[in-house]
Amino acid sequence: MASSILILKNGEYFIEDYPVKKMIEGFGSPFYVYSKEKLITNFNSFKSHFNGINHLICFAVKSNSNIGILNILAENGAGFDIVSGGELERVISAKGDPKKIVFSGVGKTIDEIRLAINHDILAFNVESESELLRIQSVAKSLNKKASISIRVNPNVDAKTHPYISTGLKDNKFGVNEDEPCRCIRK
């Protein structure tokens, strides 16, 4: 397959087998075009590097929540990293497997936690002790268990801009490296 999805044939541009001119006539300009073939090829190429290793590639829904894109990825075995109940609902409507959904982010509401537990998602990425206690409380009220992972700040400086820094002891996301055991005991 060619590296570009835009192909010039007889003086006319095509994306896959569709003439760009007809797309402009039908949709106007500007517009977004995604190549299903290219998306699948790239996803499978990336996935092939993990052959023989138990893994799950999770697409960050916040990067593109287009239902068609999510559906293509779901059909090809992708998992999903979500940060809201709305993203969870989009993945479910795109036929994504809830058992392949990881719920990240610091702003999870009680309703979003309840929705995710009721859909039996793979795991919550926990960012703080207080969030862990909220998830535990909601799960208990539903008489269910919630799987978690804990985002640990290893106190490593990646030398990025201070406003986007993560991984340091004083960063707002995640727990410090001495806290996970205390959180788990709760």
What role is predicted for each listed range?
Residues 119, 128-186:
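Conserved anion-binding
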Residues 1-146:
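A charged N-terminal "starter" segment
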